[in-house]
Amino acid sequence: LTDGSDLFLLDSFKLWAEDVFGWYYFEERSVYEPYKDGHGGRYVKKRIKKRLRKKQYLIVARGAAKSMYGSCIQDFFLNVDTTTTHQIATAPTMKQSEEVLSPIKTAITRSRGPLFKFLTEGSIQNTTGSKAKRQKLVPTKRGIENLLTGSLLEIRPMRIDKLQGLRVKCATVDEWLSGDVAEDPIEAIEQGAAKEQSTTSNNDYLIIATSSEGTVRNGVGDTIKMELMKILKGEYYNPHVSIWWYKLDDIDEVGNPEMWIKANPNIGKTVTYETYQLAVERAENNPSQRNDILAKRFGIPMEGYTYFFTYEETKPHRKQEFWKLPCALGADLSQ
């Protein structure tokens, strides 16, 4: 964990990850194979095992350790997957993107267990001596690099031009409902990741999009949610998308602590009931925070903004006269 303590996998993490890594299908492809003498060739049928899930959308309340889950998935591809992978973590702000990398950096610093001990022994400064004495897993200015496999995990800003054309193996998109992004960053990542899908090797990509419910109504989030809703209702069949959408069904359930687990499956483990109790009290007593709390803590998206006026602001003020007062005008003539 980020504070250096040991990580115990939550049941929800195991469930979400089982949904990603537990389902496979076989695909038959005709592949052209040239003859050994270099003249001519023939088409051969090959069976390829592919992972069913390519994207996972996780909409769950604040404090459910979403970024930690993304971090575990990234760590798996960086250190357990022996192929050379390019991985990215993106979020509306660079600080939020950093949250996915920080637990891995802590794990490198602590170097617990035989694998991390092996990967972190040696020094990154040892550039002239033996390769064996160099550190294999290092946080560098590019991101976190695994020098054994040549894998890289880096941070990218949530902008289309920065996410296009990346042939990523694994990408985590954090808080995609909260950022005011006009275009779809997940679509941009997927277009780049799907580039290498025509070959015979199994190069399945994975995009994990985690977020708490947002209050931004004119962003891309609502469009994505409409698509997810269609998949859930069965109007549109897409087995490659895994959806875990946690929310309260009705606003009346906010006052019932037994129902809170519907919005956050890890309540009592990663976030206390007391925190939720305080949030409910705050929403009741501070109307300006109500929409944000309902969305972020209970998964109920609220329309519009709440404006709070103090008593002084609601009092009618006397009519003002501007007759015969000096006046100033300005114009921008550069256009």
Regions found by a protein language model. Give the residues of each.
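Short acidic, Gly/Ser-rich segments with clustered Asp/Glu that frequently serve as metal-coordination loops
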Residues: 333-335
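Phosphate/NTP-binding elements of NTP-utilizing enzymes
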Residues: 1-331
